[in-house]
Amino acid sequence: CPRCGTALSSHEVAQGYKEVEEKSVYVKFPVSGEENTFFLVWTTTPWTLPSNVALCVNPEESYVKIKADDGFYWLAEALADDLFEKYEVAEKVSGKQLEGKKYQPMFDWAGVENAYYVTCDGYVTLTDGSGIVHIAPAFGEDDAKVGRAYDLPFVQLVNNRGEMTEQTPWAGIFCKDADPLVLEALEKKGQLFAAPEFEHSYPHCWRCDMPLIYYARESWFIDMSAVKEQLVANN
């Protein structure tokens, strides 16, 4: 919780879920070496995009490069009809075949190496979105797992108060309040494909009702079940 300054256990997080409606975003990541070609990426947390270091696809799923009115797009074959009314399939591959394919970073404020390419992991589903997700290892368990598997750099452009850092143009602004500013920046760069409203369940602090953020930090947790018998005996 950025307000309380404390990490929460999974049990505490489970106590504060609320249904919220906020903007998700489909982002156009330019594919390196391919003119007017983009990876179409979906996220419900635009504030994490400045900390992006990779993209991720499901290695077992089918992906297509489609020709649309305004360019070429890579996305999951099963989701193409949901996002485009009219298109032609130019190429079809497995997710595994996209592994290692490079793209141009949206924001390169961190100046990192060994970054900005496609990774693979089975956690990517085709339930929503485009079948391609962005990876920011500092903000999520799955992202961190992929980051370790590919030895990706650790970029955390949000401080422990939940504010955007000085490396971004939005220093001091609470990360979730920065969402519309990130969308505005994407639109100016011509990389905003769409920003539909998305209703989903989001965790809030059970103490203060503040929206929680998934944030990598050093923490200590006590395994109370391991000392349960001793606690009962002492009381």
Which residues are covered by each model-predicted region?
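Short linear motifs in intrinsically disordered/low-complexity regions
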Residues: 59, 70-71, 160, 224
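Residue patterns forming the tRNA-binding/recognition surfaces of aminoacyl-tRNA synthetases
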Residues: 1-50, 100-102, 111, 123, ...
